[in-house]
């Protein structure tokens, strides 16, 4: 990792992006022991409006907490992918929720249907953000899976630990398949639905 690593988690209000940013920042800062800054913003609408959370990671104290040139962009809807992709570095990591993102600006993207997995596997769309965190922890070098799990379990309501742990692992499994496809084909196609659901 360089001295600074910039992450933007983006989508619409109601997708749990702010909580996701907080959990990711705590995983990196508390459990992995790096310097971290987390900020967030909402569109003028509440649920359904635009939402983003930024996490800046560094080996030293952070003097500017806003993301400018992204090392990692997670896009949970089409609008955020279109709007923020130009901010991604040429060698940056793009992860999209292919439930909603169908027009992808580069072949070098990891496509995982976070929301569809949440609906079909867990019958709860609310865990899509935790599935996305699991995928991010496997695809990005910036945070360990162990730190993410510890941060998630410290944040979620009592009694939902198993659900959230399973959601994390579902995200990791889906990301592993996407990564294997990338390695094999040098592009990352959508993971077939039947393969995704059979792997949890």
Briefly describe each language-model feature range.
Residues 1-200:
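Active-site cofactor/cluster-binding pocket
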């Amino acid at each position: 990792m360089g001295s600074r690593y910039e992450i933007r988690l983006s989508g619409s209000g109601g997708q749990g992006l702010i909580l996701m940013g907080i959990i990711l920042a705590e995983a990196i800062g508390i459990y992995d022991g790096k310097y971290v800054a987390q900020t967030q913003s909402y569109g003028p609408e509440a649920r359904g409006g635009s939402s983003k959370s930024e996490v800046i990671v560094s080996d030293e104290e952070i003097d500017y907490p806003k993301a400018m040139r992204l090392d990692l962009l997670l896009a949970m809807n089409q609008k955020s992918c279109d709007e923020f992709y130009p901010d991604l570095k040429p060698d940056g990591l793009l992860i999209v929720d292919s439930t909603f993102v169908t027009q992808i600006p580069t072949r070098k993207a990891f496509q995982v249907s976070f929301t569809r997995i949440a609906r079909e596997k867990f019958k709860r769309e609310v865990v899509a953000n935790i599935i996305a965190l699991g995928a991010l922890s496997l695809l990005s070098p910036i945070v360990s899976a162990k730190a993410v799990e510890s941060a998630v379990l410290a944040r979620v309501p009592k009694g939902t630990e198993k659900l959230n742990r399973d959601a994390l692992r579902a995200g990791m499994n889906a990301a592993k398949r996407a990564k294997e496809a990338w390695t094999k084909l040098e592009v990352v196609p959508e993971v077939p639905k039947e393969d995704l659901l059979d792997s949890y």
